[in-house]
Amino acid sequence: MNRLLLLLALVLSGVAAESIRETETMDPTSMLEYESSGSFTDEVFVDEDDDDDYEDGVDYEIDSESDNDEDYSGSGDDDFDDEDNVEDEDEEETTTLGNQIPEHDFDETKTGRKFDTFNENNEIDNDIRHPAKPKTLEPSNEIPMASIGSSGFFQRTEVIVAIIAGTLVGLVVAVSFIVFLVIRRNQNGDLVKKPIYKKTSTMEV
């Protein structure tokens, strides 16, 4: 009898340990450790065209005679100098408003609308501008509340594993209880004692 109880205790402890091991949650930080595939630090790319040029022995030299152009005048003044002076004068000219107040008045800080902006047809443009949100390329670890509320209680893997483990433990306990009753009945004999003598019928008397 003691051996049976000891065997039953070992089976229950094994089932409980297995159910606890299955209900352990996963570490979310380990799921985000991915290896990037965009960088190749070990590989070195060599341009093969440069090697071909050196092997052919082609030298690209600038002809000194091409620098001497026939359009140069004897006075030493070049046409390029005149063009450079014109560009410098254009860059130095700046426009200033002075004390003039610009006609366009923007009130985007309060209402997000802009006023006094006219199109070609003298129509006021009162478009509402919404501030653009910065785009994040990296995935966030935040779980939206809508997805948490929509998922049912019995759809979680932890709940399903716990239910299965509890059912298995209940079956083991029920089977062991039935076996215990059968063994006890065989040891003690019949539960109902039979009478020693048998009563005679009244008809014979």
UniProtKB/Swiss-Prot annotation:
Acidic residues composition bias: residue spans: 44-94
Major place of residence: membrane
GO biological process: cell migration; convergent extension involved in gastrulation; neural tube closure; protein localization; Wnt signaling pathway
Extracellular-facing ranges: 18-162
Signal peptide start-end: 1-17
A single cellular component GO annotation: cell surface
Subcellular location field: Membrane
Post-translational modification: O-glycosylated; contains both chondroitin sulfate and heparan sulfate. Ser-37, Ser-73 and Ser-75 can all be modified by either chondroitin sulfate or heparan sulfate, and the protein exists in forms that contain only chondroitin sulfate, only heparan sulfate and both chondroitin sulfate and heparan sulfate.
Residue ranges that the UniProt entry lists as topological domain Cytoplasmic: 184-205
Membrane topology label: Single-pass type I membrane protein
Glycan attachment positions: S37, S73, S75
UniProt-listed Pfam families: Syndecan
Membrane spanning residue stretches: 163-183
Region ranges (Disordered): 26-113
GO molecular function annotation: frizzled binding
UniProt keyword annotation of NADP present: no
Tissue specificity note: Expressed in the animal hemisphere from the 4-cell to the blastula stage. During gastrulation, expressed in the involuting dorsal mesoderm and ectoderm. After involution, localized mainly to the anterior neuroectoderm. At later stages, expressed in the brain, branchial arches, pronephros, tailbud, and at low levels in the somites.
Subunit relationships: Interacts with the Wnt receptor fzd7 and its signal transducer dvl2/dsh.
Functional description taken from the UniProt entry: Cell surface proteoglycan. Regulates non-canonical Wnt signaling, being necessary and sufficient for fibronectrin-mediated translocation of dvl2/dsh to the plasma membrane. Required for proper convergent extension movements during gastrulation, which shape the neural plate, and for subsequent neural tube closure.
Full protein name: Syndecan 4-B
Annotated organism of origin: Xenopus laevis (African clawed frog)
Upper lineage: Eukaryota, Metazoa, Chordata, Craniata, Vertebrata
Gene this chain is encoded by: sdc4-b
